[in-house]
Amino acid sequence: MSKGTVALAMSGGVDSSVSAYILKERGYDVIGIYMDLWRDEREEYCNKSAAEDARRVAEKLDIPFHVINIEKKFKNNVIDYFIDEYLSGRTPNPCVACNKTIKFEAFFNAAKEFGADFMATGHYCKIEERNGRKVIVKAEDDKKDQTYMMYNLKQYQLERTIMPCGEYKKDHIREIAESIGLDVYNKKDSQEICFIPDNDHGGFIKRNYKRKISEGNFVDKEGNIIGKHKGIIYYTIGQRKGLGIALGKPAYVIDINPITNEVVIGEEEDIFRTELIAKDVNFIPFDKLEKPMELEAKVRYSAKPSKATIIPLENNKVKVVFQNKQRAITKGQSVVFYDKDILAGGGIIEGIV
């Protein structure tokens, strides 16, 4: 007897491909769906090979397969946001935006239109029930854990979402793929932003932003001009390489001012801070933070969680006070909270105190 119908987001990669197999083995009726998201004016990013890989896997596993076009919504909610953030002197996190508006909104709704009871992805996260609520738990494979990107999810989404890969090590996923004859078993993991395969975000913005990127001044902490920069989109907090200025000592980006079009340069000690303000906060194990709470937090995907006090503020904001200084806290990035192995929530870094 079927456990229900699952609409699976298929990318043509090994994780979503093996997810299809696991779900089918567990007794679900699986529908494979590939999302056509973006075409750069220079090349087709959502290329035919990825879609064809997904289609071949679906045929191999004998599951229905569909391609849906979400290009317009992806442009409005991910591409435009990505460009606007860099133009505003912030460093965006497009994967967080994509999960919030595309995978767990547009795809979530598409799954219902296909008659699915659940949706599934190949993300490395676990969804469990604790104290009567659905929570997101760190993956078995700590190196592949993707919970950092998931803090925006709501209860109604978690109740209808399955993430099979969270229970496995990546090597095991590849072994399963090879054992069942999927030719994507050794396909490389994507390391860059999916719509910028060459990892040149500045070039991407120049191609897709129809106005000139203005050069400006590098200034020191006192406001003295110390050089020329090629446009604020090319810089982020903590950056040292590629500045093109010689000061006789290591120089770091410590602030970006979009109003004056200035990039502020300082020393390494200037990029270590302990406090920040985050906006658009969402919590998962509970609806609202009523009082200060001791949790662990991290300010980028690759960072290790560090002890911090999360203090509720008005307008869905929090103040985060770390016990230890954090390197290069960056406006526009996400600060994400953990309670041991549980993803407690997160928000967008708005200010550095």
Curated annotation (Swiss-Prot):
Reaction catalyzed: S-sulfanyl-L-cysteinyl-[protein] + uridine(34) in tRNA + AH2 + ATP = 2-thiouridine(34) in tRNA + L-cysteinyl-[protein] + A + AMP + diphosphate + H(+)
GO cellular component: cytoplasm
Taxonomy, superkingdom: Bacteria
Binding site for ATP: 9-16, 35, 122
Subcellular localization, as worded in the UniProt entry: Cytoplasm
Keyword Ion transport part of the UniProt annotation: no
Molecular-function GO terms, alphabetical: ATP binding; tRNA binding; tRNA-uridine 2-sulfurtransferase activity
Active-site residues annotated for this sequence: 98, 194
Intrachain disulfide bonds: 98-194
Gene3D superfamilies (alphabetical): Adenine nucleotide alpha hydrolases-like domains, HUPs, Translation factors
Keywords: ATP-binding, Cytoplasm, Disulfide bond, Nucleotide-binding, RNA-binding, Transferase, tRNA processing, tRNA-binding
E.C. no: 2.8.1.13
InterPro entries attached to this UniProt entry: MnmA-like, MnmA-like_C, MnmA-like_central, MnmA-like_central_sf, Rossmann-like_a/b/a_fold
Principal location class: cytoplasm
SUPFAM superfamilies tied to this protein: Adenine nucleotide alpha hydrolases-like
Site (Interaction with tRNA): 123, 333
Keyword Cytoplasm: yes
Region called Interaction with tRNA, residue ranges: 144-146, 300-301
Gene Ontology process terms (BP): tRNA wobble position uridine thiolation
HAMAP family membership: tRNA_thiouridyl_MnmA
Family the UniProt entry places it in: Belongs to the MnmA/TRMU family.
Biological role: Catalyzes the 2-thiolation of uridine at the wobble position (U34) of tRNA, leading to the formation of s(2)U34.
Protein name: tRNA-specific 2-thiouridylase MnmA 2
Provenance organism: Clostridium botulinum (strain Langeland / NCTC 10281 / Type F)
